[in-house]
Amino acid sequence: MKGVYFVSGIDTDIGKTVATGMLAKQLLQQGKSVITQKPVQTGCQDIAEDIAVHRKIMGIPMQEADEQRLTMPEIFSHPASPHLAARLDGRGLDLDKIRTATQELAAQYEVVLVEGAGGLMVPLTEKLLTIDHIQQQAYPVILVTSGRLGSINHTLLSFVVLKQYGIRLHSLVFNHIHDSRDAHVAQDSLNYLQCRLKADFPEAEWMELAKTGAV
């Protein structure tokens, strides 16, 4: 595993932050030089909260790249979709700043895990969707899903749009932390999505994030 990977989810609050942190920790344990990035963080003032969570999970302090804001180039105060948060803060989202920051990280680290805001179709600006940015940068995607009710539908919709945009799915992370309380729903979701992944993206990896937080 080497290069820049975009971590997205089938929905908001699906466990992207924990999954990103755990994947980074696993790569560190394998001896990889790895960093995480949150290009757009909303609902914060000075520090991207998700980056702080990543570092805690990884077991490392805030890095020089964090202090330089390369890992958190755009922070908005209102907890909303990036396009709305930027508007409410009275300024635009600087895509060039984001691209440059990611490129600088990629030059310093073997692996860069870029955690997106929400799902693939979240608007970054009034005209640009998250998936447009992913396509433009040719990032492979790590998609986080779960066993909660509705996850099959949301995951398959994500599969459709990834195929439509010609984006490579590197892996599907099944997050047990957000499993349905109904064990039948959770297990069926796992079985169904595992089969669909093999059929739709045979080259993609299947990963599971246990309730303990281990990948």
From Swiss-Prot:
Major site of localization recorded for this protein: cytoplasm
Compartments in which it is found: Cytoplasm
Residues of the signal peptide: none
Binding site for ATP: D13, I14, G15, K16, T17, V18, D50, E115, G116, A117, G118, N175, H176
Listed SUPFAM superfamilies: P-loop containing nucleoside triphosphate hydrolases (SSF52540)
Pathway: Cofactor biosynthesis; biotin biosynthesis; biotin from 7,8-diaminononanoate: step 1/2
Keywords recorded for this protein, A-Z: ATP-binding, Biotin biosynthesis, Cytoplasm, Ligase, Magnesium, Metal-binding, Nucleotide-binding
UniProt-annotated catalytic positions: K38
Biological processes annotated in GO: biotin biosynthetic process
Binding site for substrate: T42
Chain residues that bind Mg(2+): T17, D50, E115
One function term, GO molecular function aspect: ATP binding
InterPro entries: DTB_synth_BioD (IPR004472), P-loop_NTPase (IPR027417)
GO cellular component labels: cytosol
UniProt key word NAD: no
Superkingdom classification of source: Bacteria
Catalysis performed (reactions): (7R,8S)-7,8-diammoniononanoate + CO2 + ATP = (4R,5S)-dethiobiotin + ADP + phosphate + 3 H(+)
EC class of the enzyme, as a word: ligase
Cofactor annotation: Mg(2+)
E.C. no: 6.3.3.3
Subunit structure: Homodimer.
Role this protein plays: Catalyzes a mechanistically unusual reaction, the ATP-dependent insertion of CO2 between the N7 and N8 nitrogen atoms of 7,8-diaminopelargonic acid (DAPA, also called 7,8-diammoniononanoate) to form a ureido ring.
Family designation: Belongs to the dethiobiotin synthetase family.
Name assigned to this protein: ATP-dependent dethiobiotin synthetase BioD
Originating organism: Neisseria gonorrhoeae (strain ATCC 700825 / FA 1090)
Gene: bioD
